[in-house]
Amino acid sequence: MKKYNKSIGFYGEDLSAKFLEKDGYSILEKNFNCSSGEIDIIAIKDEIISFIEVKSRFSDSFGKPKESVTCSKQGRIINAAKYYLHIKKLYNYYIRFDVIEINFHIDSSKYELSFLKDAFRV
């Protein structure tokens, strides 16, 4: 099941990246990892760097995808974002923390994508 969930996650991240590019974002990084945590997508548009968590689900039986971005997870994303900004020397940008949630339909190839800008703050 874990391998299946990972492949759904990667598929969701690919769909999200395509959505963002179509919306005018430039993708800076995908799956940025450091000791503090991981960020699914880092993108920029209009001088705003967005740190984006992607959550994909087939069912709401465990809650909405965005609900799994807990305070603890937010803290790890924030720390990873601080590290990213430091190592890339990106000091003069506005930043934002977003969530993209994707709900897949089990019986078809359709899905619903929601882009939640400014989903949480430092």
Swiss-Prot record:
InterPro entries: Restrct_endonuc-II-like (IPR011335), tRNA_endonuc-like_dom_sf (IPR011856), UPF0102_YraN-like (IPR003509). One of its GO terms (molecular function) is nucleic acid binding. It comes from the Bacteria. HAMAP family: UPF0102 (MF_00048). Belongs to the UPF0102 family. NCBIfam families: PRK12497.1-3, YraN family protein. This is UPF0102 protein CPR_1677.
